[in-house]
């Protein structure tokens, strides 16, 4: 039987990264363009980097959708957008009591980080105060790390969230700057970068990632990883487009499981010390190879996403245990 020869020494590349030698954009593209038969070797190499920085720990995050739908923005991938016809639940803000209850559910699900998310372009000062009230109570009664994702922020709002005890702020870049106008016209790529920077300047750990599979090229996919490196995102959620019926991108071809694995590996090579989270689309796009993704990533969401269902927490706990990995509770 003819043996398949690998094109690159992926392990050597991984050890170079461990020794703090940054890979090039050409290296990142090579990972994404590698033959599918090489994917296990690539994931094994990515694990060398992952294990060096994070061992066998897996961080769990839980989302609460505190305000659903009713968003004036026209992001083509989003079922909560004003232009979406997807049949989702739409509701205004949950009470502070409900948000606090969600924190205790996060603990029951063994999550260490609780993500308070609200749809919309940007929060009003009154809405920020609403979140702050819940955050203060959660901080007083739990050891959870708190992440917020509320849309665009001004400097004052970012500062008040930091003062209240918000550890992390999520604002994804979503896609490559070259591709942004094709998915959204109501704000710009630079608007998103600006909010990440405002959160960081306020002393909040920045969380920013992308949604892969929205028409970006392979080269742009690699450049997204380097852009996230440039803005110094501490946590990088890797989402994979779920082409929801009723959204403008409903006909978009979704990435294959192997393509998703290559994205995760490439992201680990480019951002070796950062928390890399397998996020939206994990169950739908990775399917039966979900466990392999954790050889590059070190974080997942547990439970449901904003408008799509996740798998049962017990399934995630079992997957982590079956890999010989351990849940890292209450840690950023």
From Swiss-Prot:
The UniProt annotation places [4Fe-4S] cluster binding at: 71, 75, 78
**UniProt cofactor note:** Binds 1 [4Fe-4S] cluster. The cluster is coordinated with 3 cysteines and an exchangeable S-adenosyl-L-methionine. Binds 1 [2Fe-2S] cluster. The cluster is coordinated with 3 cysteines and 1 arginine.
Q: Which cofactor does it need?
A: [4Fe-4S] cluster; [2Fe-2S] cluster
Q: Which domain of life is it from?
A: Bacteria
What PROSITE patterns has UniProt attached to this entry?
A: RADICAL_SAM
Q: Which reaction does it catalyse?
A: (4R,5S)-dethiobiotin + (sulfur carrier)-SH + 2 reduced [2Fe-2S]-[ferredoxin] + 2 S-adenosyl-L-methionine = (sulfur carrier)-H + biotin + 2 5'-deoxyadenosine + 2 L-methionine + 2 oxidized [2Fe-2S]-[ferredoxin]
Query: Which keywords has UniProt assigned to this entry?
Result: 2Fe-2S, 4Fe-4S, Biotin biosynthesis, Iron, Iron-sulfur, Metal-binding, S-adenosyl-L-methionine, Transferase
Q: Which GO terms describe its molecular function?
A: 2 iron, 2 sulfur cluster binding; 4 iron, 4 sulfur cluster binding; biotin synthase activity; iron ion binding
Instruction: Report any one BP term from Gene Ontology.
Output: biotin biosynthetic process
Q: In which pathway does it act?
A: Cofactor biosynthesis; biotin biosynthesis; biotin from 7,8-diaminononanoate: step 2/2
Q: What is its EC number?
A: 2.8.1.6
Per UniProt, [2Fe-2S] cluster binds at 115, 147, 207, 277
Residue ranges of domain Radical SAM core in the record: 53-282
Q: What does this protein do?
A: Catalyzes the conversion of dethiobiotin (DTB) to biotin by the insertion of a sulfur atom into dethiobiotin via a radical-based mechanism.
Give the record's subunit note. Answer: Homodimer.
Cross-referenced NCBIfam families, in alphabetical order?
A: bioB
UniProt similarity note: Belongs to the radical SAM superfamily. Biotin synthase family.
Protein name as annotated? Biotin synthase
């Amino acid at each position: 039987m003819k043996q398949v020869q690998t094109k690159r020494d992926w392990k050597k590349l991984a050890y170079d990264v461990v020794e703090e030698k940054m890979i090039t954009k050409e290296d990142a593209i090579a990972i994404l363009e590698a033959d599918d038969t090489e994917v296990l070797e690539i994931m094994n190499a990515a694990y060398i980097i992952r294990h060096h920085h994070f061992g066998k720990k897996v961080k769990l995050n839980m989302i609460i959708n505190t305000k659903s739908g009713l968003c004036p923005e026209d992001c083509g991938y989003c079922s909560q957008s004003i232009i979406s016809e997807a049949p989702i639940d739409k509701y205004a803000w949950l009470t502070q009591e409900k948000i606090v209850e969600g924190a205790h559910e996060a603990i029951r699900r063994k999550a260490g980080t609780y993500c308070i998310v609200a749809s919309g372009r940007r929060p009003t000062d009154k809405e920020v105060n609403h979140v702050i009230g819940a955050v203060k109570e959660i901080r007083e009664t739990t050891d959870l790390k708190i992440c917020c994702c509320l849309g665009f922020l001004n400097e004052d709002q970012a500062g008040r969230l930091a003062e209240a005890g918000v550890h992390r702020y999520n604002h994804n870049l979503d896609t490559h700057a070259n591709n942004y106008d094709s998915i959204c016209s109501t704000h710009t790529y630079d608007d998103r970068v600006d909010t990440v920077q405002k959160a960081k300047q306020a002393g909040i750990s920045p969380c920013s990632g992308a949604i892969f599979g929205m028409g970006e090229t392979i080269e742009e996919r690699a450049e997204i990883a380097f852009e996230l490196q440039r803005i110094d995102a501490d946590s990088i959620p890797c989402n994979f487009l779920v082409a929801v019926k009723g959204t403008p991108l409903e006909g978009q071809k979704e990435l294959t499981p192997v393509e998703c694995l290559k994205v995760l590996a490439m992201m680990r090579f480019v951002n070796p010390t950062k928390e890399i989270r397998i996020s939206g689309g994990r169950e739908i796009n990775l399917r039966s190879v979900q466990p392999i993704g954790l050889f590059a990533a070190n974080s997942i969401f547990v439970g449901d996403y904003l408008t799509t269902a996740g798998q049962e927490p017990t399934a995630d706990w079992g997957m982590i245990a079956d890999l010989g990995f351990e849940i890292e509770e209450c840690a950023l």
